């Protein structure tokens, strides 16, 4: 079932091999799919990914990948979470915000002026994806994560860790972000 439509399934004869065990929860998958599509429409985004993980066990409860088709509707075309090669920027934004929250420098309603979506940070231009449309202006941390604002996250980290970058690195290490996952 994808986007409330049942797809044709091609039955193939079973082949002996290993058992596959999934941790996907169909109810959570449906909720995540609806939430992702709602946000994709709200943001007029081309594609998006939502993954829900049980942090206590590491079990993936939902993995939703939606891409806008030529007709303007969203479809699950491929697993973007594992197939697209990209910099870890947006993932790292969440970790960066978590460090600043844990260090009690910010709260979810802390506001940052992202200006017109483009700012000069130490001689380099930092841009939000929509800078050519005027950016976001003043937004809170929740909105910074929602729209994946480069300017917002960078401004927070620069303001609170500029004089002590090691404290930021230590915060990331508290999350074991520097440890291998040993998935192989």
Predicted regions and their residues:
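Short alpha-helical catalytic segment bearing the HExxH-like zincin motif
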Residues: 90
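Conserved, well-ordered alpha-helix/loop/beta-strand core segments that scaffold catalytic motifs
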Residues: 4-48
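Beta-lactam-recognizing serine transpeptidase/beta-lactamase-like catalytic domain environment
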Residues: 2-11, 24, 48-86, 98-184
């Amino acid at each position: 079932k994808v986007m409330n439509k049942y797809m044709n399934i091609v039955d193939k004869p079973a082949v002996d091999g290993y058992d596959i065990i999934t941790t996907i929860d169909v109810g959570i998958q449906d909720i995540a799919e609806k939430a992702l599509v709602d946000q994709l429409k709200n943001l007029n985004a081309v594609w998006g990914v939502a993954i829900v993980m049980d942090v206590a066990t590491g079990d993936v409860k939902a993995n939703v990948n939606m891409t806008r088709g030529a007709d303007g509707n969203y479809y699950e075309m491929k697993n973007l979470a594992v197939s697209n090669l990209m910099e870890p920027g947006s993932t790292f934004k969440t970790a960066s915000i978590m460090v600043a929250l844990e260090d009690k420098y910010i709260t979810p309603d802390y506001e940052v002026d992202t200006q017109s979506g483009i700012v000069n940070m130490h001689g380099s231009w930092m841009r939000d994806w929509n800078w050519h449309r005027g950016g976001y202006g003043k937004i809170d941390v929740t909105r910074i994560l929602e729209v994946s604002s480069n300017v917002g996250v960078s401004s927070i980290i620069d303001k609170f860790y500029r004089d002590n970058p090691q404290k930021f690195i230590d915060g990331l290490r508290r999350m074991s972000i520097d440890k291998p996952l040993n998935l192989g």
